[in-house]
């Protein structure tokens, strides 16, 4: 079992508590920052060591090491996100669907059929799918700094240029209040659209303002960036664009087009 340690002159431990804070049951995160301790040694393991409990769904393998995305996303953030938050969503999803018809469905089928008044299934199915896509949207060494191939042509058509898309995507991420996600989706007509969702909702659910197949996902929950960027969400969004796996996003685009018969 391979591990490495990082020595800090101080260590800030951030605990995230999910609260329901208004009439719309919107989830937000309260961040508690205790006084730092000196010379704290943090041991970071391997994502391959993390296993979900037996059930219908297992963790999507993280396609890089915890430290691979640094300095854009540092190892402690990624380790906490993958081995704590994502693992919990996966285990809770399996509990929620145990001995139900959902056990034999794909996650996409579950998201399309679930009862939106069932918060346990809604939040955990969404959390599982959203994170599973998010991990694959990033890579330590992107082959391109922007969209390529078929996707680049579609962006030019729908948004005018890649740079226009980038500006619009960042603007939507910045506008999103509280916990949620920003997406690039292929809608039912085969067109690219940018949209946001609250909490762990996504464009595959029945309540989506812009329904479609997600091909690019950015997590805007504070646990995704607070250890690295604190309240500077814009810096996190900028950093995300440094590590987008455009080759994978282009594959996602072609697959999504095939689903709506536009290939």
Task: Identify the residue ranges that each predicted region occupies.
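An amphipathic alpha-helical core segment
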Residues: 174, 179-230, 238-244
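C-terminal motif of bacterial Sec signal peptides marking the signal peptidase cleavage site
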Residues: 17-20
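Bacterial signal peptide processing site
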Residues: 22-24
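Low-complexity, Gly/Ser/Thr/Pro-rich intrinsically disordered linker/tail segments
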Residues: 232-236, 240-263
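Alpha-helical scaffold segments that form or flank carboxylate-/histidine-based iron centers
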Residues: 73-87, 108-129, 209-215, 219
